[in-house]
Amino acid sequence: MGMFSELLFQLLFLFQSAIGGSMITTDKVFADPRVAQLANAAQAGDLTRIETLIKAGTPVKFVGQEGMTVTHYALRARRNAPQVIELLLKAGADPVSMLSDGNNVPHYAVSRDNADPEVVKVLMTHGIGPNWFPPKGVYNDLSMLQAAVMGHNLPVIKLLVERGADLNYVDPFSGSALHYALNGTDFYMAAYLVEAGINLKLLDSTSPEIKNPRTVRRTAIEKFCYFDGGKRGDDPLPEAADGWRVFTAALAKRGVTMPCGL
């Protein structure tokens, strides 16, 4: 249960510490004070100030500490987030903005708390498709759909699927989007993936790098039942119980009975 949570924490930590709190201010991130001002304006959602700074020649592609760019700050805009992103990307800002540890803007955009589908739509108009992958780094096997599932962002999940995300992509270690969706208590995501037609027979641990002969490859349902099935007791959280009913009903429509309980 903890593996995906830890991965998501790692994915978000540098963003949160650099742009979500008071520990690191923009003048410490960007050596160019103009860029620091632009980052502040982006985070504030001040469209007029952003336009003024861009027209004044502020370098929107400037890379700061750990690979930070103004695009990262735009994702944290307190208002007007889609418009902020659009202004910056139209001016030439980097929609990918890889950090030094491999984290990136597209994954953060779909996995952050309360991710905004409208922001994701803007990224899509600037080259970030529903099946985009990082060009390198430790997260280059993580799909956009899987990242959205990790963030528990059902509206974004639906958007990605509607735009053509590969439901049946398999991470060579962690498995399918359904593996991710069943790693927690939000079964509404799993229900949606089942209703959308995800292949229920996809396995995890398929990477040739896994040399342990004892490794057991499991479907998402098999893995859930092995590690978590029946362990939530007779009185689960109401939202978990309701999501479970929706999930098992979605399976039933496909002629599948869940082999274990909640």
Model-based region annotation:
Residues 40-45, 73-81, 108-116, 147-153, ...:
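Ankyrin repeat A-helix N-terminal signature
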Residues 49, 83-84, 118-119, 155-156, ...:
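Conserved ankyrin/ankyrin-like repeat signature
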Residues 51-59, 86-94, 121-130, 158-166, ...:
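Ankyrin repeat domain, specifically the short helix-to-loop turn at the C-terminus of the second helix
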Residues 60-63, 95-98, 130-136, 167-170, ...:
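Ankyrin repeat boundary signal
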